Amino acid sequence: MKKTAIALLAWFVSSASLAATPWQKITHPVPGAAQSIGSFANGCIIGADTLPVQSDNYQVMRTDQRRYFGHPDLVMFIQRLSHQAQQRGLGTVLIGDMGMPAGGRFNGGHASHQTGLDVDIFLQLPKTRWSQAQLLRPQALDLVSRDGKHVVPSRWSSDIASLIKLAAQDNDVTRIFVNPAIKQQLCLDAGSDRDWLRKVRPWFQHRAHMHVRLRCPADSLECEDQPLPPPGDGCGAELQSWFEPPKPGTTKPEKKTPPPLPPSCQALLDEHVL
């Protein structure tokens, strides 16, 4: 009985945490010229494009979640990157979450992906295209060792490194988030061509995918860009700090109440949802 109660409590907590946000009630892009508004973790988008789910160069995972919307620049980036990967014989690029039709906050799994400028891409490059069943329930390939200190050699490949490098060399890309162990391996393998490593940033989790972020489009006047990453390849003390044990007394940060929406995003919600 006690176990059942605990299980039910866990289910209720999980269900509450995954309660739908107002943004999920918007099922189609908001008409208008493409405008990314606000910050990556507190914003929205007008005039989002839909990434075509049929392509010779990429495949879209979990299409039932309808998270394949983004700024036209993001759609073009995905098409550009996957074409380059195909030309180099790397394999099929697997596209994960982009954003919802009007952007905005997800009910779980992402703090960002709100302005149509973020995309998750699996760090797998299958030579044979995945079936629809595989795409709907994708199996992530964990590239990082259990202790988090290095990649698993049998799962790492130069093709994966090439895909990340291709993305980082794209002029529209400002950041790529990967696990610290993946960044470390890229640093070891890079050789003398290292400028692109500046954009590759170590971050929690991200053991099986990279999270690519584009710069704010020049004509999205209400879009808030992040500062550029620090100069250098990011392979020194900053990276090594990720592998050090937590300092005594360190606790996980408490979840914060979401900040107020940018006025244009609130107006969008008021018109289309509330």
Curated annotation (Swiss-Prot):
Location (main, coarse): periplasm
Entries under InterPro entries matching the protein: Hedgehog_sig/DD-Pept_Zn-bd_sf, Peptidase_M74
Keywords for the protein's UniProt record, in alphabetical order: Disulfide bond, Hydrolase, Metal-binding, Metalloprotease, Periplasm, Protease, Signal, Zinc
Cofactor (UniProt): Zn(2+)
Function of the molecule: Murein endopeptidase that cleaves the D-alanyl-meso-2,6-diamino-pimelyl amide bond that connects peptidoglycan strands. Likely plays a role in the removal of murein from the sacculus.
Disulphide-bonded residues: C44-C265, C187-C235, C216-C223
Domain of life: Bacteria
One GO-annotated biological process of the protein: peptidoglycan metabolic process
Cofactor, free-text remark: Binds 2 Zn(2+) ions per subunit. Zn(2+) ion 1 is bound in the active site. Zn(2+) ion 2 is bound at the dimer interface by residues from both subunits.
Gene expressing this chain: mepA
Residue numbers spanned by region Disordered: 225-274
Molecular function GO terms recorded: metal ion binding; metalloendopeptidase activity; serine-type endopeptidase activity
Subcellular location: Periplasm
Amino-acid positions noted as binding Zn(2+) 1 in the UniProt annotation, renumbered to this chain: H110, H113, D120, H211
Annotated Zn(2+) 2 binding sites: D147, H150
UniProt record similarity statement: Belongs to the peptidase M74 family.
EC number: 3.4.24.-
Transmembrane segments: none
Keyword Zinc: yes
A Pfam family hit: Peptidase_M74
Designated name of the protein: Penicillin-insensitive murein endopeptidase
GO cellular component: outer membrane-bounded periplasmic space
Cleavable signal peptide: 1-19
HAMAP family, per the entry: MepA (MF_01623)
Assembly notes: Dimer.
